[in-house]
Amino acid sequence: MANPASYRPKTGEIPTDPGVYRFRDEHGRVIYVGKAKNLRSRLTSYFANPVTLLPKTFAMVHTATSVQWTIVGSELEALQLEYTWIKEFAPRYNLAFRDDKSYPYLAVTMGEEFPRVQVMRGERRKGTRYFGPFTAGAIRETVDTLLRVFPVRTCSPSTFKRAQQSGRPCLLGYIDKCAVPCVGRVSAEEHRTLADEFCAFMGGEAKRFIGTLEKQMAEAVAELDYERAARLRDDVIALRKVFERNAVVLAEDTSADIFAVHQDELEAAVQVFNVRSGRIRGQRGWVVEKVEDLVPAELIEHLLQQVYGDERADEDRIPRQILVPELPANVEQLTEWLSGLRGAKVEIKVPQRGDKAALMETVALNAEQAMKLHKSKRAGDLTQRSLALRELQDALDLPLPLLRIECYDISHVQGTNVVASMVVVEDGIAKKSEYRRFSITGDAARDDTASMYDVITRRFRNYLQEQQDRAEALTRPVEFEISDAAETAPKSKFAYPPNLVVVDGGPPQVAATSRALADLGITDVAVIGLAKRLEEVWLPEDDFPVILPRTSQGLYLLQRIRDEAHRFAISFHRQKRGKSMTASLLDGVPGLGESKQKALLKHFGSVKKLQSADVSQISEVKGIGPVLAEAVRSALESVDAQPAINMATGEILES
C-alpha cells in the first residue's frame, strides 16, 4: 500500500475554487472521482488522521499514488464533469448503483423496424422502452392480455426472418395474438402504431384507450354489428383487467419518482417507486458501498446523477416531480440540470404530509427490507469468494492476496483460425469489461505452446509499453486549468497486471507462459495451468501437480474461470471461422465487397443456406442486383462441396 503522505499536495497548491478531482493508482488508473465547492477543503480531508476515515476511504487513499484536479466555472459544471468522468473511467471506489436483478422489465424495442415486446434484464439499450420491473409471472399475464388489443410481435429475429422467407406466420398469427407484419398482413407503419399504443397504455394512458373502445362498442351496437361489439367488449374487459391491477396511490395527474434510503456505516440501500398517472408503474432498487461518510442528501445527489443522466434510457424517464427524503445541498443546480435533460420543468421536493408522505414511508420500508436481503445474500457470496481465494493463495504458496486473476485459452480446428481469449476475475468476480480476444497467425499458430507464448508476450509487452508511456507522461509539467470538458485520453487496455495467470493446459502451456514472462523481465506474476482430465494444477518447473480436493472452493473457482475462458475463445473462433468460410467462397466475385458478403450471410443465416439459394433468392438481398446474383451463384457452383465432419469422432455428417 502507498503512503498518502508520499503524494499529498501542499495545502497552498490546492485552489479554493469549485472543481472535480481524480485519485489514480500506481498504474495510472482512475480509482475515484469526486467534486467539491472548495477543492482545498475537500482534498485535505482525505489526508487527515487515518483513524477518522471510513474503511473504504482508508483503502482508497492508500491504494492511490497521485491526485489531480480540474477547476470549473460553477457547481453545475462540476456536477456535469463528475458524471462524465464516472461514466468514462468507471472508478472502482465510486458509488456503484447496482440494480436489484430480482425482477425483469417489460421492454418494447422501438428502435427496430418492426418493434417487438419482450422480457429483458440487465443493461438498458438505446431505442428500447422499459416498463417495470415486474415479476416474471405478472409480465407474462400482462402481455398475454394486452396482445388481444395491441397485437405487437413478440417473436425472436430468427423466427421473424423464417416467417418472412416462408410466407407463413407462426402460431401467434393464427390465434390473433400478432398482427403478422412478417408476411405483410399489416405494414411497418401500422405495426409501429400498434407498438406506440402499447407503450402509451403501459405509460399511463389506459383510461383514454378504454374510453375509445367503449365508444366504438356503442357505435357497433347502434349499427347492429353485435359480433364486432362483442369483440370490443372483450377488449375492454381485458384492458380493465390490466388497468385495475395497479391501485391508485396518488392523484391521477401525478407523475413522480419517489426515492428512499436506508443505510448503515458501510452501505446504503436505495429504492424508487415510479408513479405515472397516479399509479405505481415500476420499482427499482440499488445497493451501494460508501467510500465517504455520506448523509442521505449526498447519496440522493449521486443517485439522481446516475439514474437520469444515462443517455441510453428512454426519453420520458424523467417525471415532473422527484420526491426525496432530504434535499441535496445543490438542489438548484440539480433541478436546472434535470430540467434541461427533460426539456420541461422538474421539481425536487420532500413530501411533508398526505398521500405522498405515506407512500414515501412505504418506499423506505422497501429500502430497509432490500438492505436486509442484500446483507444475507452477500454474507454467503463473500464468504465463498474469500474462502476460494484464500485456499488458492495457501495451496500455491503465494505471498500476496489474489486481487486479479487472468485466464487464457487457445481455440482452433486443426490449426486453422487460431484464436485466444483472456478473461479477468477481480476479487473473485468476473470483470467482463476487461476480457480480451486475440487472433493468432503465422508461425505462432503452429501449435498451442507457440500460440500461448505469443499471446502472453503481446499482452504483457503492451502492459510494459503503457507503463513506460505513463511514466513519461508523469515526468512532464502538469498544469491545472479551468476545464469544461472531460479528458479525452484513450482508455488503457492492459495497464493493470494480474497476481496470477491461469492457462488451460498442463506443463507445456505453463512452460511457454513462464518463458514469455521471463523473456520480458516480469518476475512478480505467478503462473499455473489447469489440466482438464484430472483437474490437476501445474506450476512451472514442478515435476508433480498440486491436487486440490474435489470439494475445494479454490478448485471450483479455477474451473469456472477456465470454463469461461474456453467459452469466450470458442465464441470468437466460431465468429472468425464463419467469416473466413464466407470470404473463401465469395472472394474474387467482382463487385462483391465485405459489406455485401456480410449482407448475404445475414440474410440467409448460414453458408449452407446461401449455397442452396438460386439467383432470384440471392437478388432479393439489398444491394445485390440480378447480374451480381448470377456471379455469386456461379462462384458458389464452382466450389466443390466438402463434407462436414465431426472432428471429435471423424463421422461424416452430410455428403
Curated annotation (Swiss-Prot):
The keyword DNA repair applies. Keywords: Cytoplasm, DNA damage, DNA excision, DNA repair, Excision nuclease, SOS response. Residues 16-95 form the GIY-YIG domain. It is found in: Cytoplasm. Signal peptide: none annotated. One of its GO terms (cellular component) is excinuclease repair complex. One of its GO terms (biological process) is SOS response. InterPro entries: GIY-YIG_endonuc, GIY-YIG_endonuc_sf, GIY-YIG_UvrC_Cho, Hlx-hairpin-Hlx_DNA-bd_motif, RuvA_2-like, UVR_dom, UVR_dom_sf, UvrABC_protein_C. CDD domains: GIY-YIG_UvrC_Cho. Its main location: cytoplasm. GO terms for molecular function: DNA binding; excinuclease ABC activity. Pfam families: GIY-YIG, HHH_5, UVR, UvrC_RNaseH, UvrC_RNaseH_dom. Interacts with UvrB in an incision complex. Belongs to the UvrC family. The UvrABC repair system catalyzes the recognition and processing of DNA lesions. UvrC both incises the 5' and 3' sides of the lesion. The N-terminal half is responsible for the 3' incision and the C-terminal half is responsible for the 5' incision. This is UvrABC system protein C. It comes from Renibacterium salmoninarum (strain ATCC 33209 / DSM 20767 / JCM 11484 / NBRC 15589 / NCIMB 2235). The lineage of its organism: Bacteria, Bacillati, Actinomycetota, Actinomycetes, Micrococcales. The gene is uvrC.
